[in-house]
Amino acid sequence: ATLQAITAGGFTMTVNGTLVVISAVNLSAVTSFAQAASAIQTKLQTQKPGTLCSYDASLGKFVITSPTSGVTSTITVASADVSGLAAAIGMLSATLVQGKSEETPEDALTQCEQYDNSFYGVALDSEYDDVQASYDAAVWTQARNKVFFNTTNDADCLTATAPTTLVGQMKDASLKRTSATYGPVAGSYAGVSVAGRAFTVNFEGTNTTLTLMYKKLPAITVAKLSSSQKGHLASINCNVFLDAGGNSIYDEGKMADGTFFDTVHGTDWLQNRIETDVFNLMYRSPTKVPYTDTGVSMIIQKVERGLRQGVTNGLIAPGQTTDGTYLELGYRIDYIPVSDVSDADKGNRIYRGVTFIAVGAGAIHKITITGSFSE
């Protein structure tokens, strides 16, 4: 009834620094708050196009929104109330929310991290493909135990200028936690498709680890490239879903520094598995893990449990270490007896004596076969 009594209402305010004078607002025929908001918006549009007026039923408030965003988006409380219109819609004592600078992906990731740091994979909206924000996200990810899946549509990656591209810069920075994928179609989210395939691995299974090489990427356009173009992509460790002899395959599954993705993914899993098992050993103990050789043996059992699962899932296999030592189990665990631990560490209840070395099973990507034939 208060609104319907207004036949020639008005008020003044500023929107983005521009004075807006609203007048001759007739609400005598409205039957809802939404209709009243629509009538006010019609007047606002004539003064400041794009300015909106709506009614939020959940809050029970009228909301006026400027037509822009960012730090230049400002609005002021209404004044010069005519016929009580501003008072009726709560604009004389309204809560003001001014525009802010655009949040960068790096800022958003930091906020996510502070709220819940359990996420592992990172990918950005396609609007950030091939812009500085994607490089910043890659650097952000590198500083944490996470993986960034980057998508590029930059055709320069297919030419001799590839090293100057953002992907080339990622290679130069040796970003071991960034996987870059070239997609011929803008907005394809090729990197997201890679993440979806990569994260299907069940490390608690048997022979479940995989290489990304030769895999399919559903809904991703296949790139038809010349050998020269493929070479330029390879020179900057940029992956691609391409046509190879009539077959669609992902090539080659490397990170920006040249490390294969499955190595990074697998060792991250192994670290998390061992850390979790050792933590649970202490957390679930009704008493304690004693600082004795018996306590150290309990820790070693948990470390070996993770390594054995690494053998089971195919991450680890018997083989030679870099110094030529053959490990029949695929791993070796060493430890320091409690008697050799420093008094300072024992006094602080810190044990640093367990180390291990493991041999990765790896994967075969290319095969060279030689032979001869005589008749």
Residue ranges and their predicted role:
Residues 23-30, 127, 285-292:
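Second-shell loop/turn segments in exported
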Residues 7, 105-109, 270-276:
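Structured alpha-helical segments in the cores of large, soluble enzyme domains
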Residues 33-44, 64, 122, 296-307, ...:
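Amphipathic, non-membrane alpha-helical segments that mediate helix-helix packing
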Residues 247-375:
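Structured, hydrophobic secondary-structure cores that serve as assembly/anchoring elements
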Residues 1-85, 135-136:
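Extended, beta-strand-rich, solvent-exposed assembly scaffolds of outer structural proteins
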Residues 55, 76-214:
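Extracellular Cys-Trp
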Residues 114, 168-299:
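Extended basic-aromatic, gly/pro-enriched interface segments that bind polyanionic ligands
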